[in-house]
Amino acid sequence: MTCQLKVRSKIVTALGSGLLFLVAGCGSDEKSTDKHAACDFGAQTGCSDGQVCEKVEGGAEETGCFAPVTVEGRVVRADDPNQGIEGARVVGRDENGAVVSLRIAVSGADGAYSLRVPTPRKEDGTPAVPALLLRADASGFATFPSGLRVAIPVDVSQPEKSEAGYRVVNDTTTVALDELADASGLGSVSGKVLAEGAAGTLVVAGGASGVADKDGTYVIFNVPAGELEVRGYAAGLSLEPASALVKAGSEVDGVDLAVSDAALGAVNGSVSFVNASAKTTSVVLVVASTFNEALKRGEVPRGLRAFPVSGAYAFADVPAGDYVVLAAFENDELVRDPDESIGGTAIQRVSVSGSAMDVAGFKITGALAVVAPGKDAPELLDGVPRFEWADDSSEDGYEVTVLDTFGTEVWKNVDVPRVSGASSVTLDYAGPELSSGYYQFRAVSWREEKKGAASRTYISATEDLKGVFIVP
């Protein structure tokens, strides 16, 4: 999903939406000072102080010692980007949830963090910084990404060379978090995933989640008080669940997740395309307890994303648990067919417990293109929002809904009239005054089964991740 960010005043580009994954490099005449020294990439040993072991592309040696590459930035309040957030856990991941950074970083008093990113080098030392997206969690703040906030790729195209190595630091490395309206009844859970390959494991308790570090340690912030089950999710990893008695304002530590001998399962299904020019989409498995019914999104564990999908799809090595299956969720000019009167249009749910599970096929249709705001990325607005989207060809009208960043409905108009002779439809917002924050408009086209009938058949809709705008 391609995104171009629009930034003004205090709005931070790290708040944007959309997914584009790039691998870029920056030219350098740097030579590895220990070019022929033996070093162990996995153990990170064999290099002198100030250097790290990296893989070498196309060289005589498979590894070499080089100055490190770091991604640096700040975690700040969304309502006051000058104020940093201390104690936030920041991790770099790829599009499938695998950890790209060497370790999770914890922000300092001013919100500053630094992530060491293992980076392949050319033989002359030129770094090819891998694509990565940032996730940040902090006590009392909504996780980024979550709600309407979708991770954007860090701009790794121009790493800055310094005496200590290479630094990636720009607007995309600043992460702004939304403060929760009420955190009084929340606590936290911490522990360790006791398994090899634990890095990136999604750990969930009470609908809240955290990500395990390379050594398996994890912290889940903002967990509702009560006795809760704690579970870990990652493709290919089976873990025993644990329990935690969470008290508001305190942390339950030592909640470790051991490897289980329970069999992994599988999820199989298919998609079909109706009235769609695009014929390739993606399918993801969302942990059910994290699913937001209003926004139709949630947390996807490492490795449980299938792309590209043009017909049948299959997830292997799926850990036990309850999942929501989403298709055509990403920006691909497609949406799940909104006509609930026919088969293959409902969101699928599946419980996995060691066997193969088949889910009903999805019908996918072409999306209504968003013109403004939020065509490519969250858009900062001045004044009353005016919504514009592509006209459908056979509609009798539209329904438009405005949601806030947590999925709460702010305003709805269910009788937007059809247009004739125009390529797009416009509608001025006429709801209550919007406070500062993120919002999304969604449009759905409909037609009447019979003229004057009360029942409606829904035809198409705007995409799940588009139409997002920012009120300053």
Name each region found by the language model.
Residues 9-17:
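Sec-dependent signal peptide recognition
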